[in-house]
Amino acid sequence: MSVPQPRLTLSDQPSQVRHVVIISEDGMRPDLIYGQQNMVWHEQLYRNGSFSWKARTIRTASTLPSHASMLSGVDVDQHGLTWNTWLKTRGFIRVPTIFQAAEENGLKTAAFVGKPKLRHIMPAGTVGIFARPGYYCKKVSDEAARYIEREKPELLFVHFSDPDEAGHSDGWMTASYRKAALASDACLGTIYRALQQANMIDETLVIVSADHGGHARGHTGAIPSDREIPWIASGPGVRRGYHIRSAVSTMDTAATALAALGLAPLTRISGRPVSEIFQSSTRTGL
């Protein structure tokens, strides 16, 4: 059994946060977000929130290991997911995730994903709902939006596959990749509108990030464009239009989500809350 750890603290953590939504855009490069027109929902979030274009994923810059680190707060040597495909015989993540911490505190959790291999991170019994409505983000976001409006979860993870699929098919930063990024932007809007419709937006910390970037038709992790990822946070108490100064790791996503909800990790983690995103006026003493 995991030994509960002390609560991670955000010195400026806002008491208004009641929900956290993490949206991962598979293979999304940060320079695509700030360097392309019509990324309207991304722009709305980073102009009204805090952001880093130099956040980093783990050295194993691929979907399954990276998402495991994003949602557990530890590196691959601890979580054990070294492969990158659905292999039921290999088993599941060997450390607790943020969903288990939330579930143990009576919070409602859910995950809507485009790739079945992410089940290795969230086996049955560790997350309230695990759903794969389809591969592309339109089906994923539509189903997640309906769930948001109906259930109002405290912790939600949504995964979009579109940028990664286009990158592998035609190349990162190609016309088709840019088109896929625009589709992902529209799906981000679907989630945001659902939060508004459910009257959750004023109590929700939204974190938008990615598992890895890419170049040519792959992402080995050997160069910056593979490991650099966007990291955007928007919500109550978050600094507006603020460029994060400190280094941000994908493992910090887990830590920030837990701290924002006032939860302790179920085991020791490497990630740390990105506390500078919060305004000093919302200090709660955590």
Please identify what each model-predicted range represents.
Residues V20-S24, D31, S52-K54, S69-L71, ...:
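Structural recognition of the beta-strand scaffold that forms the well-ordered cores
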Residues V21-I22, W41, A183-P224, W231, ...:
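Metal-dependent active-site segment of extracytoplasmic phospho-/sulfohydrolases and closely related
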Residues D26-P30, F51-S52, I58-S62, D75-D77, ...:
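Solvent-exposed loop/turn segments at secondary-structure junctions
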Residues D31-S66:
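Short, structured active-site-proximal loop/turn typified by the sulfatase FGly-forming signature C/S-X-P-X-R
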Residues L71, A222-A264, S275:
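Substrate-binding rim/cap in mid-to-C-terminal beta-strand-loop elements of soluble/periplasmic
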Residues D77-V140:
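Catalytic-site neighborhoods of secreted/periplasmic enzymes
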Residues P116-V127, A145-A186, T190:
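Active-site His/acidic residue clusters
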Residues L263-L286:
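Polar, surface-exposed loop/tail segments
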